[in-house]
């Protein structure tokens, strides 16, 4: 089950990247990892550094995807973001935290993307 969830997560992140590129976002990193944690997607658009958490679901059994980005998860993303900014020396950017929800259809290969801009703040 763990590998299945990881595969679904990777698939959803790829769909999210495609969506972002089609909407004129510049992708800087996918799956950035350091000792503090991971950020799914780091992008830039209109001089804003955008940190994106991707969540995918087949159904609402466990709630809508955004609900799984808990306060502790948000704090961890913020901590990793600060580390990334220092590492890459990206001090002159405003930062925004988004969530991209990917709703997958079990019957066919269709999907729906919901991009929640400014989903949480520092």
Swiss-Prot record:
Gene3D superfamilies: 3.40.1350.10. It comes from the Bacteria. GO terms for molecular function: nucleic acid binding. InterPro entries: Restrct_endonuc-II-like, tRNA_endonuc-like_dom_sf, UPF0102_YraN-like. Pfam families: UPF0102 (PF02021). This is UPF0102 protein CLH_1204. PANTHER family: UPF0102 PROTEIN YRAN (PTHR34039:SF1). Belongs to the UPF0102 family.
